Amino acid sequence: MTKKPIVVGVTGGSGSGKTSVTKAICDHFSGHSILMIAQDVYYHDQANISFEDRLKVNYDHPLAFDTDLLISHIAALRRYETIEKPIYDYAKYTRKKEVEIQEPREVIILEGILILEDKRLRDLMDIKVYVDTDDDIRFIRRLLRDMKERGRTMDSVIEQYLSVVKPMHNEFIEPTKKFADIIIPEGGENHVAIDLMTTKIESILQKHV
């Protein structure tokens, strides 16, 4: 690898369209080697507590994440070092014993709801993107996803949204918008904003020699 890796942070609330924006970046830079890192797999290892206690954890709070490990891994990738990325078991709410070996790439995309909350992590990013989507749309997307993909009931999704997701979004996620270099309204449907973002990434790539 002859160029210094570029780190792109993509954040926004749950259901904002972060995945669509990330896919747009991957499609645009398909000629480059790309590595996607999801903040979700850096939830703390909870093997030492019961399953019942794991269900009580607030997974939308900054303290739910092993941010120190994530920071060390992003820093290592920027130094062209290999990392052992955790594998998270969403059914058991803890990490698996296995890890995934990841090599550094030209473009590293870091995606997650709270990646801009910690200054140490922000400082490792070359460009920071906030996907800004209407609260009602985000809630509907989360409702449909959790019922279809995670077997949740409508009542449980609504209760969690009102008691945890929405308050945490307002307290921790929304305020990080001010740290973004680019704000993309309406997520992956905003092609003009995505074009602006990819142009900015291209200019940074050209300088990273």
Swiss-Prot record:
| Chief location bin | cytoplasm
Provide the top EC class.
Answer: transferase
Q: Which SUPFAM superfamilies match?
A: P-loop containing nucleoside triphosphate hydrolases (SSF52540)
This protein's UniProt keywords: ATP-binding, Cytoplasm, Kinase, Nucleotide-binding, Transferase
Q: Name one Pfam family in it.
A: PRK
Enzyme Commission number(s) of this protein: 2.7.1.48
Q: Offer a single GO CC term for the protein.
A: cytoplasm
Q: Which InterPro entries match?
A: P-loop_NTPase, PRK/URK, Uridine_kinase, Uridine_kinase-like
Q: In which pathway does it act?
A: Pyrimidine metabolism; CTP biosynthesis via salvage pathway; CTP from cytidine: step 1/3; Pyrimidine metabolism; UMP biosynthesis via salvage pathway; UMP from uridine: step 1/1
Asked if the record carries the keyword rRNA-binding, the reply is no
Positions bound to ATP: 12-19
- Keyword Transferase assigned to the entry: answer is yes
Record localization: Cytoplasm
Q: GO:BP terms for this protein? A: CTP salvage; UMP salvage
Catalytic activity annotation: uridine + ATP = UMP + ADP + H(+); cytidine + ATP = CMP + ADP + H(+)
User: Where do transmembrane segments lie in this chain?
Assistant: none
Instruction: List the CDD domains.
Output: UMPK
Q: Under the GO molecular function aspect, what terms does this record hold?
A: ATP binding; cytidine kinase activity; uridine kinase activity
Q: Which PANTHER family match?
A: URIDINE KINASE (PTHR10285)
Q: Which family does it belong to?
A: Belongs to the uridine kinase family.
Q: Which protein are we looking at?
A: Uridine kinase
